[in-house]
Amino acid sequence: ALHRKFNSPKDKLIFDVGHQCYTHKLLTGRFDDFDTIRKDGGLSGFLRPEESEHDIFVSGHSSTSISAALGIAQSNAILGKTDYTVAIIGDGALTGGLSFEGLNNAGKTKTRLIVVLNDNKMSISKNVGALPRHLAVIRSHPSYFNLKTKVEKALGYIPLVGKPMTEVIRRVKKGIKNLFYNSTIFEDMGFAYMGPVDGHDVETLEDCFEVAKRMKRPALIHICTVKGKGYSFAEKSPADFHGVSSGMDINTGECDPSGKSFSGTFGKKLCELANNNQKICAVTAAMTDGTGLSEFSKQFPERFFDVGIAEQHALTFASGLAKGGHIPVVALYSAFLQRGFDQLVHDIAAQNLKIILCVDRAGIVGEDGEMHHGLFDVAFLSTLPNAVIYSPKNFAELESDLETAVNGQNRLYVIRYPRGGESIPAENVPRDFECFCGKDKSTLAVSFGRVGENVLEAARELDICGLSFNKIKPIPEDAENFCLDFDKIYFFEEGVENGGFCQNLLSRLCQKGFKGDAVITAPEDFVAHGSTARLLSCLCLDKQSIINTVTGKTQHKISGQRVKSNEKSGADESKTDKTDIGESKNEKSNIKKNNTCEIGIEKSKAEISGINEGKTEINDAENGDAEKAALE
């Protein structure tokens, strides 16, 4: 209906997040490639302007469509264009405060802006009975609009009483509508409100869009849809089918069990701790299942708070809980946490409140892609005074970190962990860092979190030294001192380099007189979608790539580049092109950046990048007792 009534891309269709855009992609030239969606080198599951001229605005984080659409509409008005701009937003995304900021601003304009509210839960307003549905159909039809316009014009010609009569009719009509459903919130903001209407009735939708195009002010069309319409399993369990794996059986609706995960381990451990501590509360932002808090919500409903898509509110709300004497545990995805930085500074860190921030989906997340990878949290969280940051590489470290935070002092604790499960179960007692000391005492490989495990495995195979951090702020001083005497240190980070852990650690080492060489492997740009294993390999963060980097056999370009859609998949070996990125205070230090080997990804139009985590324990090779003693 949208594509029949609007002329895309001249008229701009702005979809909020990406879950609504699949049909849009099928209708705009990507039908033949649709089986590649969310796969390595295939179509993105979200809107990507570089993928199609019909994808106007990047999508991924919710609640942005109205503000973006209003900006485009205002730009059109300045340029004298008559194009239409349409924002399509779901009722879930409308819980985000940014949506209402956009609505509040848009209602004051006379722009050609149309907002389509896709309500698949009836959570905005419920109509009651047949009459309101009948009224909605009538007032959404072009003939109604034509008649309404003619009557208003005719009344306007009547001297003295014409305009007052028009206003009386409007008030009566508004009063009748309010008897049946609450649409005044949008009309009070200045929108012409239409609906609710059946979102599965194409003819009615086309009528609504035609009417909205004739409005002299912004219009909001409220449509009601059934999530998963046409697929019985999805209709019965819509929450379970919000996102499914490629291993789903379409005939039964069953998915392959994902196994034990960091999220599940976090949720289980938090329930255990909450049983013994009545002060513990859990807060999330519309991600109860994703963050592993479903069981907590059932066991402790009075201490569980899902605040909707409102990360800023979640953090300030948690600070209020902390002021009241509770221990709030806030579980958010890394990519969405970016929205709450001011709250972290102003409402939490500045007051030194005890809040435990559990950052899920830290690092590469796989098929969700560019806007969902958690590549920035270490960089911005490291700037917060007094914060303690952990990045566990396995479940045992996660459980230990969570227990330490619950029993810790008043301050912000951050525990960040990746999507999915652990690669290798813990063999040693969790601690702040883990070290392997090989025969080669001149070379050290360093990382943290998930990639820290890869570093340790690579170090064992190469018989060099490896250091994996669990506690990344403040950096353990004995681990720092251990790094000082190496001739060469290779740093690997599953996140942005600037402001990241590896850069912070290297800076501290240089201040302490480090005289060796340093090579940093970290992304410089955004990362495309694809399998986690492939992306980590492309970013030179898997075990084999770490081995190749240290030995100089093969190195991957890690700066990240936008790749044309006709480029073929595969990593090509090429010449080494290390670039000096600066000298430390000690002039003998030679700090290099690993920046070699281009990577082509078939049909990918986004960039490659990555972020890392790690932890450390002591496993001694021959003659390693001295190093162990030094660390202890």
Residue ranges and their predicted role:
Residues 6-7, 11-14, 225-337, 343-353, ...:
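Non-catalytic terminal/interface segments that mediate subunit docking, oligomerization
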Residues 247-249, 254-258, 366-368, 387-388, ...:
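Peripheral docking tails and interdomain loops at the edges
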Residues 207-210, 242, 261-276, 292-298, ...:
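Glycine-/acidic-rich phosphate or pyrophosphate-binding loops and their flanking alpha/beta elements
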Residues 33-43, 108-122, 143, 349-361:
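A glycine-rich helix N-cap at a beta->alpha junction
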Residues 165-233, 354-359, 378-428, 488, ...:
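Structural signature of the thiamine diphosphate
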Residues 1-109, 279-280, 284-285, 293-294, ...:
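Cofactor-binding active-site loop characterized by glycine-rich and histidine/acidic residues
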Residues 306-307, 460, 464-483:
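Generic long, charged, amphipathic alpha-helical segments
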Residues 121-266:
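Long, well-ordered, tryptophan-enriched scaffold segments
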